[in-house]
Amino acid sequence: DAGSDLQSVRLKATFDDEHNCWRLNGVKRFITNGDADIQLVLARSEEGTTDGRGLSYFLYDRRDNAVTVRRIENKLGIKGSPTAELVFNNAPALLIGERRMGLIKYVMSLMNGARLGVGAQSVGLAEAAYQEALQYAQQREQFGKAIIRFPQVYEMLGLMRAKIDATRTLLYETSRFVDLYKTYDSISKERSLTAEERQDMKYSQRCADMMTPMLKLFASEYANQVAYDSVQIHGGSGFMKEYKCE
């Protein structure tokens, strides 16, 4: 039930001294690719805690037969990535990294990549919807001329193009900042960074942390708007499955 409030994760992790491993118990919902054999999972390892400082990161193998996929969600889209509800019944798991750092350090570091993925996916979807609308508007004739020659349709296509180009620019700039700070992080494992490099790394990370949620917001919103407008330009045909914009 935690949803986006990751600090409220309630899946419980307890250490099994006899078998020298961690055990996971509880339910998790809306888990991306939840039917995979190997999974990373955030769980509460510190008894009595209620915030992010009590969460650790674990790896489990579903082939241990201690995790049940209770259901696969029937989603509106993104059907190639199963979203599952999982039940953990004393599932053995391995601790990843340090205790108590699951959310603060590890999950948050993965969020930038996930948000970039959503942004790129949204830009691609919007571009495809625009191209379908443009092609249809150029070919479909009403009242003796192609509908792209009607001001309302031409203006709608222009706004769609502007939204896509703006979002693509935000995607590329956000990706640049993520690349920079990750590159500096990799270099720092081989040698000490100069003062200028450390400053640039911190700046790039701050920009990435700020821009990735913005990218996810605007890209996904504009993708929905562009897809909707594509259906509108297709008219009644946009409601039919034989047309790709549906």
Say what each PLM segment does.
Residues 1, 28, 45, 62-64, ...:
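A broadly conserved detector of short glycine/acidic/proline-rich loop/turn motifs that flank catalytic sites
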Residues 8-10, 19, 35-38, 52-55, ...:
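Active-site lining segments that contact anionic ligands and/or coordinate catalytic metals
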Residues 63-66, 70, 82-114, 131-149:
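A glycine-rich, basic-preceded beta-loop-alpha segment at the flavin cofactor/substrate interface
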Residues 9, 27-28, 69-74:
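Short beta-alpha junctions and helix-cap segments that line functional grooves
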Residues 6-8, 16-17, 21, 87, ...:
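Alpha-helical interface subdomain recognition
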Residues 1-16, 48:
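Beta-sandwich/jelly-roll carbohydrate-recognition scaffolds of carbohydrate-active enzymes
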Residues 1-4, 30-32, 49, 75-82:
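Short Gly/Pro-enriched turn/cap motifs at secondary-structure boundaries
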Residues 21, 25-67:
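A short core secondary-structure module
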